[in-house]
């Protein structure tokens, strides 16, 4: 049986790993073993952060909605409660877009939510 030399494959494999590790600091971009370890960790971080990003955006939307609704005299909690009572199905992403880009439309939604809320004197009032 003929002898198979694998130098070409090995060099290509190492070159691909080192090319993907460009931009890393120190040995992590220069030495094959360190670069390979760092790439494996990078893939794990990427996977986890793609899922984390969804929660990050939801938190951002809620902060924007809360700020805009407080400017209109209602807390975030009461706004969501009022929108549900008024049977208005608008998700937080759309609400935050309205709050940032179309303040008049957002104010209209706040007005509808206020009208749908039960008259509760113990509810907190936004400053």
UniProtKB/Swiss-Prot annotation:
Family classification: Belongs to the bacterial ribosomal protein bL20 family.
Superkingdom of origin organism: Bacteria
Keyword Protein biosynthesis in annotation: no
GO terms for MF: rRNA binding; structural constituent of ribosome
GO cellular component: ribonucleoprotein complex; ribosome
Name the UniProt record assigns to this protein: Large ribosomal subunit protein bL20
Protein species of origin: Renibacterium salmoninarum (strain ATCC 33209 / DSM 20767 / JCM 11484 / NBRC 15589 / NCIMB 2235)
Gene Ontology BP, a term: translation
Pfam families the record matches: Ribosomal_L20
Keyword field contains Transcription regulation: no
Keywords: Ribonucleoprotein, Ribosomal protein, RNA-binding, rRNA-binding
Role played: Binds directly to 23S ribosomal RNA and is necessary for the in vitro assembly process of the 50S ribosomal subunit. It is not involved in the protein synthesizing functions of that subunit.
